[in-house]
Amino acid sequence: MNVMTALVLAFTLGLGLASLNSDALKNVARDFQEIIVRMISAVILPLLPLYIFGIFLNMTHSGQVYSILMVFIKIIGVIFVLHIFLLVFQYSIAALFVHRNPFKLLSKMLPAYFTALGTQSSAATIPVTLEQTKKNGVSAEVAGFVIPLCATIHLSGSTLKIVACALALMMMQGMPFDFPLFAGFIFMLGITMVAAPGVPGGAIMASLGILQSMLGFDESAQALMIALYIAMDSFG
């Protein structure tokens, strides 16, 4: 099953569940979601370091590891700067509507940010994010609805990281790319991030399918993407 088929199936099932409003079917869907999340958390993620270690052993043997690590450091630096720019931009737009200082709004969210650094999970950070959002003057009703909903679907930081890393790897490996192809990839990635599980590394695992089908990433390129993403997962 390719990625487009899986997405169409997911949307069809979602619309069907909503229209039928069957509690039994909804419970089945929730249980299946829990199975997938537990599989990623308990099986796939613990084994990923071994897989990535093997990839780096192979690169060391071929003499590529130093040049790749140097590129990694540059990519991480660029993405960190982009994260800061994105946060300042988003909070500046919000501050225009509420006539407040965006940096004061950002400073009140620092406890949530540091919690996310430690947990590497947007879902686990929800209680702290909710509390700090209320301290920023957001009503309890709005915060209680928006924060749990958007914590795991508004993955703008994950989208930014994956797009930047994919572009850097394609340029580094001399892979052909053009704007229409990458625009389609970004669009599909945005849709995929809506369904990405809110667990450490969940976003990159959800995006592997379109990295392979749309950009032609092989197993080694996917492993490099996973390694890059995991290294930056906590800060955005």
Language-model-detected regions and their locations in the chain:
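Signature of multi-pass transmembrane helix bundles
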Residues: 1-104
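Helix-loop-helix junctions within the multi-pass membrane cores of secondary transporters/permeases
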Residues: 115-193
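Membrane-interfacial loop-to-helix junctions in multi-pass transporters
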Residues: 2-4, 40-44, 81-82, 96-105, ...
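Transmembrane alpha-helical segments and their short flanking loops
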Residues: 163-236
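Alpha-helical transmembrane segments of polytopic integral membrane proteins
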Residues: 10, 49-53, 86, 90-91, ...
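Hydrophobic alpha-helical segments of integral membrane proteins
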Residues: 25-43, 69-72, 76, 102-113, ...
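Membrane-embedded alpha-helical segments of transport systems
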Residues: 3-7, 44-47, 150-161, 229-236
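Small-residue-enriched core segments of transmembrane alpha-helices in multipass membrane transport
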Residues: 33-36, 72-89, 108-115, 183-196, ...
